[in-house]
């Protein structure tokens, strides 16, 4: 079980409410809440954990939880940026990859770490992020070893 955070989530909620409007979506509310929590890190370091958890939760809410579906979506939206061999490997090994990826590990990032990943390393088009940190790690690991991998499953 995660240790209890020593912060006031009420303060973050009250400050977030002041930014709400009728047309705002839940993803924007999450981003506002995460930014408010991040701005309170100087009051207590646990606000960092709150901010990062909100960011990761929002990222998970807006991305697919299947690696194969993620790489297909990336390729469809980003002009076939990924190698066919990587996509084929993901398709053939869908169950193994699903068992291997532990999305809870995404929650180990601190706020500024996840911000850097989102801004610079996770594949996205415009402001639409397609992958989670664990997807990025899997994409890099498979890509590094593609020449040593049998993609037809035999």
Question: PLM ranges: what are they?
Answer:
Residues 1-154:
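Extended catalytic cores of very large enzyme megasubunits
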């Amino acid at each position: 079980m995660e240790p209890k955070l020593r912060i006031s989530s009420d303060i973050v909620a009250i400050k977030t409410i002041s930014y709400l409007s009728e047309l705002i979506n839940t993803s924007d509310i999450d981003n506002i809440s995460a930014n408010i929590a991040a701005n309170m890190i100087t009051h207590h370091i646990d606000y960092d954990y709150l901010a990062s958890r909100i960011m990761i939760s929002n990222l998970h809410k807006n991305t697919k939880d299947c690696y194969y579906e993620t790489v297909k979506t990336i390729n469809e939206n980003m002009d076939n940026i990924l190698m066919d061999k990587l996509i084929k490997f993901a398709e053939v090994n869908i169950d193994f990859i699903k068992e291997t990826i532990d999305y809870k590990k995404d929650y180990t990032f601190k706020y500024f770490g996840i911000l850097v990943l989102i801004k610079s390393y996770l594949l996205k088009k415009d402001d639409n992020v397609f992958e989670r940190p664990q997807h990025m790690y899997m994409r890099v690991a498979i890509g590094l070893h593609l020449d040593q991998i049998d993609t037809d499953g035999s």
